[in-house]
């Protein structure tokens, strides 16, 4: 579900060609760094072109390195970017025990949105 085109990694969603072993109707490409990379401060910069389609949900999430030790929601999750369908915005959200179990989402704000260029690259 991916191609390398002119030095760009292109992730795709495709109709599942073999539903005998996996019954989901569609399969998608993705990058999973679970147990491969941990970040301790600093800046993470990602350049991505976000296509639009019904049902599309490209996302970039940060989760705990030791997820078994810190399960969701206590370990938290930072949604760096989620783009839905044909929206001209991306969503940024923080999930945690504070926001999920205690339902405190406004002080401080749980998330925000920002404009994107659906036809171009976004950083």
Question: What are these model-derived regions, one by one?
Answer:
Residues 1-123:
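GH16 jelly-roll
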